Structure formats: C-alpha cells, structure tokens
C-alpha cells in the first residue's frame, strides 16, 4: 500500500474537523485539476447567479460531462463570495438547468458536494428555498443520464441531498454526510451544544458508517491526515473513481438506470 494512504484511526469528531479543515480541497479545485476544458455557465434564468454553486461543461478521459460543485472557497474573500458554501434557491435552480441540459445532450453529470446546508436566510425562503430543493430531488430521480455525486467535505441537510440523488454516491474518507451538523444534533436533541463529539459518534455521519448502511456506494481513500495533506494525490484517486464509474454506468440501459436510482432512494432506511 502507498505509504501516503496508510490507514489511521480517527474518531467521528476528528473526521468532522478534517472535513472542515480550512485547507481542504474545494469542488472548484477538483474541477480544475481532474477535468479538461471546463466552461462555466451562470444563472438560473429566473433571479440571478448563485456563486455557492459552480457548474458547466468539461471533459474527462475524452468523455464530455456536465460538472457541478457546491463550494465554500479557499480564503476569506472566496468564503464571502461563495456564501460559505450555503446555496440560495437560484443556485439549485442553476444546477437543475445544467442537469436538464446534460440530459438533452446525453452528457453524464458529476456533482461535488461540500456544504453545511442550504442558506436559511429570509430572502432565500421568500424565493422558494424548500421548493427548489424538492424540485431537484424530484427531477434527479428520473433524469435520463448517468449521475455521480461525491461528498468532498461536509454534506449536510437537504442542501446536500439536492445534488446527491445519483446512480453512484461516493464520500471522501474523512467527509461527513448527515441530516444536520453535530452542533445542531446536540442542541436539538440534548439541548447541550457542548456534546458535539458525542453527537458526531451517535449520528453515524462518517463515510465508514454510511457505507455500512448502504447509503453510499463507495469510499474514496484520502492521504494520511486528510485530503489537504496532498490534494494532488487525492485528485488522482478521485479521478480514477469517477472514470471507472462513468465507464460502468455508460454500459447500462437508461430505463434500468433510472429504476435502480429510484429504488436506491426508496429503500434507504429500510433495514428490516
């Protein structure tokens, strides 16, 4: 085994800290590193252009794809520009516009997800935040093109799920995926936000936990200590995962693909 990828044991809370690390590679980094000839598209054709979600067309190993990412940015000015990775409804509508375009032109879709959730501001609610997320869930469940989603950092709440109704769902080894943050879990269930470490363990939010529940399809190994320790290596492993999955999905009948995708999500949580 490559010494950079030697297994180390981390607690669920340590995975949260790694997932939130300020130097963790962003979705934008993976787009720039893994794909060629990326052309970004803007706007939802209704209200505006949400910078928390970037998307466009690109190629990977001579396969034309649509690529979309919820991204937080990598410095203070980027954090503000990207709204700390919390999309507004126009972001989700932009993503859906690009996905419908991908369906029309028979391009597979690759989604990178890193968000603490959809933006909960008054303006977002007035512009239909819940409806935008619900519409994405509905449309993605029947979209006639292969979809691959990767949780690269945080994947929390419906804001993450809105880009994760996919044929293949992967998590980076130290990413997290949950209905809410450990802080929210501890505050709501125990009325004690100081119990975040306990909440992280109880909520089963790690890649290992979710693979055990068949919520995700695979775990993408990270370099020792996290993706931020060696972003280039991480991107190489992630690229291979994406290419292998694309080749597998492209061989499947579209109707079978849609049926499998729909049933995958209908069966989630059905453990008996």
Swiss-Prot record:
UniProt keyword Lipid biosynthesis present: yes
EC class: transferase
GO molecular-function terms, A-Z: acetyl-CoA carboxylase activity; ATP binding; carboxyl- or carbamoyltransferase activity
Keyword vocabulary terms for this entry: ATP-binding, Cytoplasm, Fatty acid biosynthesis, Fatty acid metabolism, Lipid biosynthesis, Lipid metabolism, Nucleotide-binding, Transferase
Key word Lipid metabolism present: yes
Chief location bin: cytoplasm
Catalytic activity: N(6)-carboxybiotinyl-L-lysyl-[protein] + acetyl-CoA = N(6)-biotinyl-L-lysyl-[protein] + malonyl-CoA
GO biological process, one term: malonyl-CoA biosynthetic process
Compartments in which it is found: Cytoplasm
Subunit structure: Acetyl-CoA carboxylase is a heterohexamer composed of biotin carboxyl carrier protein (AccB), biotin carboxylase (AccC) and two subunits each of ACCase subunit alpha (AccA) and ACCase subunit beta (AccD).
Family the UniProt entry places it in: Belongs to the AccA family.
Physiological role: Component of the acetyl coenzyme A carboxylase (ACC) complex. First, biotin carboxylase catalyzes the carboxylation of biotin on its carrier protein (BCCP) and then the CO(2) group is transferred by the carboxyltransferase to acetyl-CoA to form malonyl-CoA.
Protein name: Acetyl-coenzyme A carboxylase carboxyl transferase subunit alpha
Primary gene name: accA
């Amino acid at each position: 085994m490559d010494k950079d990828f030697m297994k180390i044991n981390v607690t669920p809370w340590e995975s949260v800290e790694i997932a939130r690390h300020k130097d963790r590679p962003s979705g934008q980094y993976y787009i720039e590193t893994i794909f060629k000839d990326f052309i970004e598209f803007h706007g939802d054709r209704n209200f505006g252009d949400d910078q928390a979600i970037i998307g466009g067309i690109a190629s990977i190993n001579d396969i034309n794809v649509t690529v979309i990412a919820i991204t937080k940015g990598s410095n203070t000015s980027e954090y503000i520009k990207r709204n700390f990775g919390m999309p507004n409804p126009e972001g989700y509508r932009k993503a859906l516009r690009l996905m419908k375009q991908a369906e029309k032109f028979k391009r597979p879709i690759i989604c990178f997800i890193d968000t603490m959730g959809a933006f909960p501001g008054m303006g977002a609610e007035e512009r239909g935040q819940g409806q935008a997320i619900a519409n994405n869930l509905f449309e993605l469940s029947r979209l006639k093109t292969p979809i691959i989603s990767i949780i690269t950092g945080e994947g929390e709440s419906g804001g993450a799920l809105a880009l994760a109704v996919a044929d293949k769902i992967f998590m980076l080894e130290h990413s997290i995926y949950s209905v809410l943050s450990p802080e929210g879990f501890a505050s709501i269930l125990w009325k004690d936000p100081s119990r975040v470490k306990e909440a992280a363990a109880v909520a089963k939010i790690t890649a290992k936990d979710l693979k055990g529940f068949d919520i995700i399809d695979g775990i993408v190994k990270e370099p020792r200590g996290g993706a931020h320790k060696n972003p280039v290596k991480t991107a190489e492993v992630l690229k291979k995962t994406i290419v292998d999955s694309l080749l597998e999905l492209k061989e499947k009948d579209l109707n079978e693909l849609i049926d499998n995708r729909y049933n995958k999500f209908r069966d989630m949580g059905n453990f008996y």
